[in-house]
């Protein structure tokens, strides 16, 4: 059944629990930092989720990998399209190398 906003009388929102949902905290940080950091966050999340779905990492390794990628990145305040594409590939490579190295265990 579709959600009917007219029948819905009230919506209640609470502050998100960013300690339990650490990936959300990292996403907020990437957005607030700006520049090239959202690209790193997105690319790291994409690759980590893909490897989780393949059974190569644990679910809780996803935010660990994202955090490592963000910490490893040197921020570019106003990246060009070519820089964004390079950062994306570098982040994919960083995630793969980190998984292969066994640094998550």
Please give the residue ranges for each predicted region:
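Catalytic, metal-anchored helix/loop core of enzyme active sites in primary metabolism
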Residues: 1-105
């Amino acid at each position: 059944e579709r959600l009917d906003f007219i029948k819905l009388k009230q919506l209640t929102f609470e502050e998100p629990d960013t300690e339990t949902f650490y990936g959300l905290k990292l996403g907020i940080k990437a957005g607030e930092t700006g520049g090239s950091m959202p690209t790193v966050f997105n690319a790291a999340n994409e690759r980590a989720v893909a490897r989780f779905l393949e059974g190569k990492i644990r679910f809780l390794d996803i935010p660990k990998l994202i955090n490592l990628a963000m910490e490893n990145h040197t921020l570019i305040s106003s990246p060009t399209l070519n820089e964004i594409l390079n950062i994306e590939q570098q982040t994919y490579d960083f995630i793969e190398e980190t998984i292969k190295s066994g640094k998550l265990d």
